[in-house]
Amino acid sequence: MNLFDFFRGRQKQTSASVAKERLQIIVAHERGQRSTPDYLPALQKELVEVIRKYVNIGNDDVQVALENQGSCSILELNITLPER
């Protein structure tokens, strides 16, 4: 590092370094999304089909979430049932 660079302050980031940072953010986001199992959407669809045999509900009335807490996985199922 040159003494003059120190007094000039921080130089602008190059477009390559900005692109690299953005790509790292995107990759980290994609890896985070990959943690959910692939079968979750199919499970939700099948649950809606089974519940529809008995109750009139829409596709958005069933929410399925999978949570990992240490060595334990928790499957949370929320069903909004219509009024009678």
Swiss-Prot record:
Gene symbol of the encoding locus: minE
HAMAP family: MinE
InterPro entries in the record: MinE, MinE_sf
Name of the protein in question: Cell division topological specificity factor
Pfam families per UniProt: MinE
Family: Belongs to the MinE family.
Keywords: Cell cycle, Cell division
Protein's job: Prevents the cell division inhibition by proteins MinC and MinD at internal division sites while permitting inhibition at polar sites. This ensures cell division at the proper site by restricting the formation of a division septum at the midpoint of the long axis of the cell.
Single GO BP term: cell division
